[in-house]
Amino acid sequence: MAWFKTALAAYGATALFILLWSSGAIFAEIGVTHASASTFLTMRFALATVMLALIGAWRHRWLPARGTRVHVAATGALMMGGYSICYFLALERGLTPGLLAAILGAQPIATLIITERRFSAMRMAGLFMAMLGLASIVFRGASALNPSTTEGLALALAALASITAGAIMQKRIVQEPMDVLPLQNFVGLLLSLP
């Protein structure tokens, strides 16, 4: 019975994460049609900050370990602030969620290219094919862009750069996610304030 609870916790958390993450683009597009990107993000980060503060109070841990807080905050500035702000502004400027998702789909590939020290021929061929596939989708979608949505494309690339740099920095953090998320989310809230 214990193995079932462990499996349910592991797979349930993973399934919940995938559900929440994948539905994000849909709710983001709905959100920016009814509020500015700044207002929507401020409300989103404020709600998450309250929820994380409640969890922190229950756990009796509010902040990451001393000596890591600046790095954790800088990582949050990129992953929570930079990524989210650029993402929502790209939608607000008219970039479609599909094109935005295709551009951001390059993040794992970009992270691997930057962090990998040795590449096998097979891995390079796979990365090249993945980049070609993404590029064909992005260029097909970008060809329909008008000058007003070109800014959205630049913001999508800034979101990609932010999430890639943040993911690389996050790899150096060896604390539990619940030890770093409250501070990272709070930094995102501060950056999103109008």
Predicted regions mapped to residue ranges:
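C-terminal ends of transmembrane helices
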Residues: 52-63, 108-120, 164-175
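A helix-boundary/kink motif common to multi-pass secondary transporters
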Residues: 36-37, 95-96, 176-179
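Specific transmembrane alpha-helical segments of multi-pass solute transporters/efflux pumps
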Residues: 20-25, 53, 57-100, 136
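Residue-level signature of transmembrane alpha-helical cores of multipass secondary-active transporters
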Residues: 13-14, 71-76, 101, 127, ...
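Glycine-/small-residue-enriched transmembrane alpha-helix faces in small-molecule transporters
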Residues: 1-42, 86, 132, 145-172, ...
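Hydrophobic transmembrane alpha-helices of multi-pass small-molecule transport proteins
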Residues: 52, 75, 106, 119-141, ...
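Specific alpha-helical transmembrane segments that line the substrate/conduction pathway
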Residues: 39-50, 84-122, 159
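Juxtamembrane helix-start motifs in multi-pass secondary transporters
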Residues: 40-41, 179-184
